[in-house]
Every structure is written in C-alpha cells, then in structure tokens.
Amino acid sequence: MIKWLWKANKPQAEMLAQWHEALNIPLLAPLNEPEQQRLVSVASQLLQQKRFIPLQGLILTPLMQARLALLFALPVMELGAKWLDGFHEVLIYPSPFIVAEDWQDDLGLVHSGQSVQSGQSWEQGPIVLNWQDIQDSFDLSGFNLVIHEAAHKLDMRNGGHSNGVPPIAMRDVAVWEHDLHHAMDNIQDEIDMVGVEGASMDAYAASNPAECFAVLSEYFFSAPELLEGRFPAVYQHFCRFYRQDPLARLKRWENSLADNPPPENTHSHR
C-alpha cells in the first residue's frame, strides 16, 4: 500500500502533484485545477472510507485504486463523499463475470439461470465491477461503468431502492419523472426503428427508469454534448442534481486548446 493515496490532510498543491498520473485520463482532461483539487479531495476521502477488493487473482496497484476512486468521486465532486456512504466495499473482477439469477416469466413461473454481468449495485450492499470495463471508462465515449453503478447508489438514497429519482426536492419530482420517461420512450422508439445496434444511445436506458437514470448519467459525464442535444430537459435536471455542467466544462477546455495549441513535434537533422 502506498500511503500517499490515503493522506487527505496534505496541502492541496502537494496532493495534486501526487495524483497527477492518476488524473491523466481523457475523461478528466476538461477539469481545471480547482476542479481537480476538489475531485482529488473527494477521491481521497473515498479511499479512506471504502475497501477495494480484487477477485480472481486481480492485482490492484495504487494507480489503479487512485483512478477508480477518481471515477467514483466525479459524480459527487460537488455533492461530497457522504453521498456515496451507502456502501463500504467494491468487489472487482478482472473481466465481466457470471452470476446465477432467478427470473419470472409471463405465467408467473420462476426459472433459474446464469448471465454475464459487467457490474452490480446491491441494495444495502457492495458495488461489483470488473477491471476490463473500468479501463474502458477512462475516455469520453459515453460509456462509464463506475458512474453507472454510482448513479444507482445515489438513486437508492431516495427510499432505499432505485426508481430513477435520486434525492431531489418534492416539487421537482413530477417533471423529473416526466422528462425521464420521455427519454425512455424516445430511446425505445429509436430502437424499434433502427434496432439495438443502430441506436445512438445504449438501449439499456429504455429498460426502466432506474437504468435510464444510470445510463444517461454516463452520457452526462462522458458524452455531455450527446445528452444535451438529445434530451436537453434531462441534461438540465442532471446539472441541478449533480451541481455540475460537464458540457460547459468540455467547451471551456476545447476553447483553451484552440487558443493554446500544443507545440508541434520538431525533428532536427544533421
């Protein structure tokens, strides 16, 4: 265990320097320095509060743990680490895993079987992830397993079960549900027209309100231009709930790159 990762009481500048390598992933590139400092502060708290448990021979290096903590911290960067206090352990498989499950058919008969899962959030229990998909969550592609499962935990704070409505003001619930269901119906209509593979968003979002909230939270943080363009009302709801505006952050970063392009590689010849 490398101790610096867990020392949340260090000066911010020193702490940020130590986290520099962990922060160096595309998903976090748009964050400015104050945002990085807030993110690292929350991630440090989460590393102190949670146990990351590798399974099936997976070896978790300090860098891997730091990056995982940063991914968990991103959705609660402005809310605070306390918003993820509904679990204490994160179980991590090397790759998607097989689980036994029971399901009920239309006649009410219960069947048993197995399915391959990328992740799970257990009510009043741990989060289960796999490192293969965690690595695929480092970019700005619209896919983010960690944010998906964290969103389920945030959803569960509102009554102990996930229904697509996290803790928000009662006066906002009706319009939140209306806009979320509109998004679900719209995604399902697209699936009906072009099929699952041709849909512009993950078809899993059309499953139920809880999955819609979790999937659209992935887009909110890792493909905000797609979510805002497709469902602007949902995007605004999420801005208010998460207290962040990832699209504005992305545009700010892109503008800074345009104003200050990186130097071209030069080659000297003898």
Swiss-Prot record:
InterPro entries: MetalloPept_cat_dom_sf (IPR024079), MtfA_enterob (IPR057256), MtfA_fam (IPR010384), MtfA_N (IPR042252). Its main location: cytoplasm. It is an enzyme of class 3 (hydrolase). SUPFAM superfamilies: Metalloproteases ('zincins'), catalytic domain. GO terms for cellular component: cytosol. Its cofactor is Zn(2+). It comes from the Bacteria. Keywords: Aminopeptidase, Cytoplasm, Hydrolase, Metal-binding, Metalloprotease, Protease, Zinc. One of its GO terms (biological process) is proteolysis. Its EC number is 3.4.11.-. Gene3D superfamilies: Collagenase (Catalytic Domain), Glucose-regulated metallo-peptidase M90, N-terminal domain. GO terms for molecular function: aminopeptidase activity; metallopeptidase activity; zinc ion binding. The keyword Cell membrane does not apply. Interacts with Mlc. Involved in the modulation of the activity of the glucose-phosphotransferase system (glucose-PTS). Interacts with the transcriptional repressor Mlc, preventing its interaction with DNA and leading to the modulation of expression of genes regulated by Mlc, including ptsG, which encodes the PTS system glucose-specific EIICB component. This is Mlc titration factor A.
